[in-house]
């Protein structure tokens, strides 16, 4: 990756030079109209922060290991939209820093994403949760899908379970999707839905969590419980995604 100057960063506008380079080098053309109305500045000027393109490659590989389950694309690999790479996957997973033990970890621990309807929210969520559970280098990872009700939890869980169940790569890796959880028996890594604080209190130590459709959550108790539970993990990620026009 080429060296980046402060003036480069100032001219980059919607994308950091690092992410812009990543998209160009991987063939993603990001239309101007997809630029978010608001976004958190990336940590390019922060001491110790650096961009690791290989980490973004791994997330995208996890997405491509999943399969469409409906319509004309059924059975074909998922593919991220350029805007998903530029404004979500590359910034969240590409920026890293060394922790107190000298280990390289993600810069971001929390993400809030708002997108209009019919813009691949389910696909994006599925890819990130599968990556966190089974490809992030975290043995025995617990990934929880938080929802405001059991019905909403199923809406978050079922598309991920279907995409995993249709994936030959997931099957080869020993990952199985069941009615109430997706699990890798070799180390107990798991994805499962939760719909109340009580669901999260017994033996949970989440490496990541998804809060889908945040606007339907009655309160923040469940999310706060999940945030507290991530304390023992080296690089947890809380991912909140909701419909922008809801």
What are these regions (language model features)?
Residues 2-246:
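Phosphate/NTP-binding elements of NTP-utilizing enzymes
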């Amino acid at each position: 990756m080429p060296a980046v100057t402060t003036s480069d960063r100032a001219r980059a506008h919607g994308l950091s030079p690092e992410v812009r380079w990543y998209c160009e080098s991987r063939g993603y053309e990001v239309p101007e109209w997809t630029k978010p109305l608001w976004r958190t500045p990336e940590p390019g000027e922060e001491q110790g922060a650096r961009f690791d393109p290989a980490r973004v490659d791994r997330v995208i590989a996890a997405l491509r290991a999943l399969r469409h389950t409906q319509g004309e694309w059924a059975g074909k690999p998922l593919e991220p939209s350029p805007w998903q790479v530029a404004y979500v996957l590359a910034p969240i997973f590409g920026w890293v820093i060394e922790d107190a033990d000298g280990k390289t970890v993600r810069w971001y621990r929390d993400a809030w994403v708002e997108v209009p309807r019919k813009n691949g929210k389910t696909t994006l969520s599925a890819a990130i949760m599968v990556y966190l559970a089974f490809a992030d280098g975290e043995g025995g990872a617990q990934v929880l899908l938080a929802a405001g009700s059991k019905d909403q939890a199923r809406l978050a869980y079922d598309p991920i379970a279907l995409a995993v169940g249709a994936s030959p790569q997931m099957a080869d890796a020993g990952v199985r999707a069941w009615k109430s959880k997706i699990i890798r028996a070799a180390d107990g890594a798991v994805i499962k839905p939760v719909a109340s604080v009580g669901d999260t209190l017994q033996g949970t130590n989440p490496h990541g969590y998804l809060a889908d459709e945040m606007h339907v959550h009655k309160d923040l108790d469940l999310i706060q419980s999940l945030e507290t539970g991530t304390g023992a993990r080296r690089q947890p990620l809380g991912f909140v995604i909701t419909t922008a026009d809801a």
